[in-house]
Swiss-Prot record:
GO aspect biological process, one term: peptidoglycan biosynthetic process
PROSITE patterns reported in the protein's UniProt record: PGM_PMM (PS00710)
Cofactor note: Binds 1 Mg(2+) ion per subunit.
Cofactors, names only: Mg(2+)
Protein name: Phosphoglucosamine mutase
CDD domains: GlmM
Catalytic activity annotation: alpha-D-glucosamine 1-phosphate = D-glucosamine 6-phosphate
EC number from the UniProt entry: 5.4.2.10
Length: 457
């Protein structure tokens, strides 16, 4: 059955426009609260956290009303990274967690996603169950009487608990003394906790994006804008820079020379180091089809392997749990270290990389050399609808011709974004000029038929 509200990462849209309205938020709260009430012999509670978007306040209030109306209590943790909410949900033995965030999207957008009691994202079956209640006629009859409604409580120490958790993921015999780090928090959920963690471990921290005002989240800052980070690293003579996104579930780095180090390179560094220590489960890394072929080559040369999934960190986690793997992630900077957390965690990922730097004494530029990336070009086409490109003859012919031209020296990957109205065209090959021209050729044809193109660097 096709979902009506949930996408690849919860429910998402422009705030105050369907489906990201207070009415839908309240209905989501009601339906989820009913489903997560496993029995009626105890009080149930759901954790709610958010990022720094202005619309987070109204959505939070609507969710609280819906959840409490079904007889479930709420723990409000305020602005906290998405992985922090997953951690609090599990550690507080809550029945579920809710994140109000649109991750790396601009402030006008917002979203609602759920974690189950164990801190993992919901399976499709549970999301469909929630939607069935929302669009059915049953839920009104399930409401409890007045003396059984839930209460909302503020949890003032959630940030402190998450800081301790993060520090405990860093080796006890190491510290960050002597490291100068430029940290960009994207004016998002990590603006308090991330600097505190690095400073408490001994680093000298230069902060960017730590003054949220409700409308500046991800605005020219964070993991999608490494240029400003690179500039700051050079200006301050830092050893490296790291940038989180709005909900801090992803991270990218800039080395001491100002060169970007993306998720593929971070995974290569960490997985090869874990293999040397015998800590990479089954000598296997899980990544998505968007990852660079250079990552596969690096792992294969070291005696490991890469297992590929569809795009989306939830699919990476599902494969990791299915196969018993402990490291996976995406080129975008989502990385999951299942030994520590249940979802992508930018700070956990950063601390694992920083530990390798401190233990080996090598600069990030040298560590990144373990992987040689093949040239990749990514072009986005904004579309009005998700039409099957294979049924548009001119598009299908163009794509086939490009694939035949690349043959075994590269690949073409075209997919719709799971969170935005974009068709992503990715080409990979040995000659950057050639694949740039070929990607442009495909994009021009798609633009004529389906939408407006914007280029992503």
């Amino acid at each position: 059955m096709k979902k009506k509200l949930f996408g690849t990462d919860g429910v998402r849209g422009v705030a105050n426009i369907y489906p990201m309205t207070t009415e839908i938020a309240m209905q989501l709260g009601r339906a989820a609260a009913h489903i997560f009430k496993k029995d009626h012999t105890r009080r149930h509670r759901i954790v709610i956290g958010k990022d720094t978007r202005l619309s987070g306040y109204m959505i939070e209030n609507a969710l609280v009303a819906g959840i409490c109306s079904m007889g479930v209590d709420v723990l409000l943790v305020g602005p906290l990274p998405t992985p922090g909410i997953a951690f609090i949900t599990s550690s507080m033995r809550a029945d579920a967690g809710v994140v109000i965030s649109a991750s790396h999207n601009p402030y006008q957008d917002n979203g609602i996603k759920f974690f189950s009691a164990d801190g993992f994202k919901l399976p499709d079956t549970t999301e469909l169950e929630i939607e069935k209640l929302i669009f059915g006629n049953e839920i009104d009859s399930l409401r409890p009487v007045a003396d059984e409604v839930g209460k909302a409580f503020r949890m003032d120490d959630a940030g402190g608990r998450y800081i301790v958790f993060l520090k405990n993921s860093f080796p006890q015999d190491l510290d960050l003394n002597g490291l100068k780090i430029v940290l960009d928090c994207a004016n998002g959920a990590a603006y308090k906790v991330a600097p505190a963690v690095l400073e408490e471990l001994g680093a000298e921290v230069v902060t960017l994006g730590v003054k949220p005002n409700g409308s500046n989240i991800n605005a020219g800052c964070g993991s999608l804008y490494p240029e400003s980070l690179a500039k700051a690293v050079k200006e301050h003579g830092a050893h490296l820079g790291m940038a989180l996104d709005g909900d801090a579930d992803r991270v990218i780095f800039v080395d001491e020379q100002g060169q970007e180090v993306d998720g593929d390179q971070i995974m290569a560094i960490c997985s090869l180091d874990m293999m040397k220590q015998g800590k990479l489960a089954h000598n296997t890394l899980v990544s998505t089809v968007m990852s660079n072929m250079g990552l596969d080559i690096a792992l294969r040369n070291a005696g490991g392997q890469v297992v590929k999934t569809a795009v989306g960190d939830r699919y990476v986690v599902e494969e990791m749990r299915r196969g018993g793997y402990n490291l996976g992630g995406e080129q975008s900077g989502h990385m999951i270290f299942l030994d520590y957390n249940t979802t992508g965690d930018g700070m956990v990922s950063a601390l694992q990389l920083l530990a390798i730097m401190q233990r080996t004494g090598k600069p990030l530029s040298e560590l990144a050399g373990v992987m040689t990336a093949l040239p990749q070009v990514l072009i986005n086409v904004r579309v009005a609808s998700r039409q099957d490109i294979n049924i548009v003859p001119e598009i299908a012919r163009t794509v086939k011709a490009v694939e035949e031209k690349l043959a075994d020296t590269g690949r073409v990957l075209i997919r719709y974004s799971g969170t935005e109205p974009l068709l992503r065209i990715m080409l990979e090959g040995q000659d950057e000029a050639e694949i740039t021209g070929l990607a442009q050729e495909i994009a021009d044809v798609i633009e004529r038929h389906l939408g407006v193109r914007t280029k992503e660097q």
